[in-house]
C-alpha cells in the first residue's frame, strides 16, 4: 500500500473515532412563561434543567418562551429540543411538526386541570350571559385555558366574542387576573393553577376574583420532544425515566418543581385527544 494511502486511512479512522467519542451537544429545554416575569420563570425552572442535565449526562440549556404559541413554534423549528408546554401548544407542535409527548405533569397528584372564566365579585356578573356588552380578555392564541377551550365553549353556546363583548383583548394570564381584581377588566379566561398560585403568592386576593365558569377536566401540561429526537429511543427512554423519578427526588430537592407539582406520569398522544378535538371543532386546527 502506498505510504500516502496508508496515512490517509489512519487519518480517516482517527477522525471517525473522534466523532464517535464526541460529547453530544446541549439539549435546549423550552418552558412557557408560567411565572409573572422571565427572571422568576428562569429561576423556577432552572433546578429542573439542572436535574435533567445530571440524569442525562449532558448539558441542558433553559429557554423561557414568552408565549404558548411561540413555545409550540420553537419545538417545531428546532429552537428547542424538549419542552414543558401547555396542552394546546403541544397539540399544535404535534400536528404541525410531529413533536411527541413523553410525560404529563401532576398537579396535586392529578394529570388534569381546569380552564376558568373569572370576574370581580363587585361586578354583578354571575354567568357568561351576564358578560354581554362587557370587556373580556383571552390569553395568547397558543393557550389552552386562555383561548382554545373558552373559544370552544363560546362556539357551543352560539356566542361570537367579536360581537358579544364590547371589547376583546389578548394578554398574559397573570395580567388577566390582575386587571380583573382591580376592576380594569370585566372578565377573562384563565386556569385554576394560575389563579391558585397568584393567590398563594399574594399577587391577588381570593375575595377579589370570582369564578363564573369552569371547564371539564383538561389534560395537564405536556413534556414533549421534537420530531428530530423522537427516533432517538435511547434518549427518549432516558428522559422519560428521569421525569418519572422526579416525584421521589422532590423529597430531597423540594424546589425542583413549583408548588403543587408533584412529578410526572407517562402519557402518550391519545391523552390529548380532547384538546385536539376542540381545535378541530373550532377550525383552529386543520384536518389531516
Name these PLM-found stretches.
Residues 135-234:
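Pocket-lining segment of extracytoplasmic ligand-binding domains
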Amino acid at each position: 500500500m502506498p505510504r500516502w494511502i496508508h496515512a490517509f486511512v489512519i487519518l480517516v479512522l482517527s477522525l471517525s473515532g473522534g466523532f464517535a467519542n464526541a460529547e453530544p451537544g446541549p439539549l435546549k429545554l423550552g418552558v412557557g412563561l408560567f411565572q409573572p416575569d422571565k427572571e422568576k420563570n428562569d429561576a423556577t425552572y432552572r433546578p429542573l434543567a439542572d436535574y435533567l442535565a445530571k440524569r442525562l449526562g449532558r448539558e441542558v440549556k433553559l429557554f423561557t418562551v414568552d408565549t404558548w404559541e411561540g413555545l409550540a413554534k420553537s419545538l417545531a423549528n428546532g429552537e428547542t429540543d424538549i419542552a414543558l408546554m401547555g396542552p394546546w401548544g403541544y397539540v399544535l407542535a404535534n400536528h404541525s411538526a410531529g413533536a411527541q409527548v413523553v410525560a404529563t405533569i401532576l398537579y396535586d397528584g392529578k394529570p388534569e386541570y381546569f380552564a376558568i372564566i373569572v370576574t370581580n365579585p363587585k361586578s354583578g356578573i354571575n354567568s357568561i350571559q351576564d358578560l354581554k356588552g362587557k370587556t373580556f380578555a383571552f390569553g395568547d392564541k397558543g393557550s389552552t385555558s386562555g383561548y382554545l377551550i373558552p373559544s370552544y365553549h363560546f362556539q357551543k353556546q352560539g356566542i361570537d366574542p367579536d360581537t358579544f363583548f364590547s371589547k376583546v383583548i389578548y394578554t398574559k394570564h397573570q395580567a388577566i387576573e390582575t386587571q380583573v381584581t382591580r376592576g380594569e377588566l370585566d372578565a377573562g379566561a384563565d386556569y385554576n393553577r394560575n389563579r391558585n398560585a397568584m393567590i398563594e403568592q399574594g399577587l391577588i386576593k381570593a375575595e377579589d376574583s370570582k369564578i363564573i365558569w369552569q371547564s371539564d377536566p383538561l389534560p395537564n401540561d405536556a413534556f414533549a420532544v421534537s420530531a428530530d429526537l423522537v427516533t432517538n429511543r435511547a434518549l427518549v427512554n432516558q428522559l422519560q425515566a428521569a421525569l418519572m423519578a422526579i416525584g421521589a427526588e422532590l423529597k430531597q430537592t423540594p424546589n425542583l418543581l413549583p408548588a403543587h407539582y408533584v412529578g410526572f406520569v407517562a402519557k402518550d398522544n391519545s391523552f390529548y385527544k380532547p384538546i385536539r378535538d376542540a381545535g378541530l371543532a373550532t377550525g383552529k386546527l386543520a384536518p389531516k
